[in-house]
Amino acid sequence: MELIFLGTSAGVPTRSRNVTAILLHLQHPTQPGVWLFDCGEGTQHQMLNTAFHPGKLERIFISHLHGDHLFGLPGLLCSRSMAGPPHPLTVYGPQGVREFIATTLRLSGSWTDFPLQIEEISAGDILDDGLRKVTAFRLEHPLECYGYRVVEHDKPGALNARALKAAGVTPGPLFQALKAGKTVTLADGRQINGADYLAPAVAGKSVAIFGDTAPCEAALALAQGVDVMVHETTLDASMEEKANARGHSSTRQTATLAREAAVGRLIMTHISSRYDDKGCQRLLAECRAIFPATELAYDFSVFPV
C-alpha cells in the first residue's frame, strides 16, 4: 500500500496546500485498487496531478461532514459519471452523508451513471474484502467523526520447496495444496502436512487514518501498533488548549499518541493556514522531539506503508 496526499491544509486551502483528501493505493499483484479518504473542495482537480482518475476509485471513506473534508464529493461524483465505464462505487461516512449526497445532486439537477452505494456507519468493522479489513473508530470532534484502521490480512509463509523435494514430493499441483496448508497423500500412501513446510505467516501492513479529533480513548485503539499513523497536527504545542476546544490536537499530543501506540511512523497533516514553511518545520520539530519517526505531509507527498 501507499498513501498519496491530495490535500493537507486544515479548514481552508492555501497557495500550497489544498484541504483534506488522501488516496490509498492498494498495490496488490492481482487485485489492485484505489480508495479515497475524505474529499475536501477541489479534490478532483488535485487528482489530475496524479496517475489516478476518479473512475478508478472503488471506495470513499468520509471522516465527518465538515466542509473541508466533504465539499469536493458532489463534483467528484458527477465527474466520475463522465469518466468511462460505470464501475461501482461505495461511499462510507457518518449519519447524514446520504442526505448530503442526495440533496446536492437533486438541487443541482445532477445524477450518477454508475452503481452508487452509500453506507452510513457506526464504530466497528465496516468492511472485509477478503484481502484487508477496515474498522471505524469514533473520535472526539464537534460533529460525528471517525478514523479508519486498514489492516491487510496476513500472507502465507513461503513453502520450503527444497525440503519437500527431499521428501519425494514432485513440484506441481501438490505444491499448491501444501502452500494452502492442506494435507496431501502421496502415491506411496504417505501423508504430508503443508503446515509443516511453511514458514511463519507474513504480517499484513496496517495504517490508521484519523479524522479530526481531540485526544480521546479510541485514538489509542485505532493507532495501536500500525505501520503508519496519519494524524492531524492542526496547531503547535503552545496552542494546545485552543486546539482541544475545537476538537483538534496539538503537535505534542499527536506525537505522544504515536509513541504510546508504538506505531512505525507518524505522518503529520491537516496543518493550520497560519503556518508558513518555516512554521511547518517548527511543527515537525515539535513532533520529532517526542517521536523521531515523524514525517510532514505536503500536497502530493507519497509515502509507502
UniProtKB/Swiss-Prot annotation:
The active site is at 68 (proton acceptor). Binds 2 Zn(2+) ions. Zn(2+) 1 binds at residues 64, 66, 141, 212. Zn(2+) 2 binds at residues 68-69, 212, 270. Keywords: Endonuclease, Exonuclease, Hydrolase, Metal-binding, Nuclease, tRNA processing, Zinc. Signal peptide: none annotated. Its EC number is 3.1.-.-. Its cofactor is Zn(2+). InterPro entries: Metallo-B-lactamas, RibonucZ/Hydroxyglut_hydro, Rnase_BN, RNase_Z/BN. It is an enzyme of class 3 (hydrolase). It holds the Pfam family Lactamase_B_2. Transmembrane segments: none annotated. GO terms for molecular function: 3'-tRNA processing endoribonuclease activity; exonuclease activity; zinc ion binding. CDD domains: RNaseZ_ZiPD-like_MBL-fold (cd07717). Zinc phosphodiesterase, which has both exoribonuclease and endoribonuclease activities. Belongs to the RNase Z family. RNase BN subfamily. Homodimer. This is Ribonuclease BN. It comes from Salmonella paratyphi C (strain RKS4594). The gene is rbn.
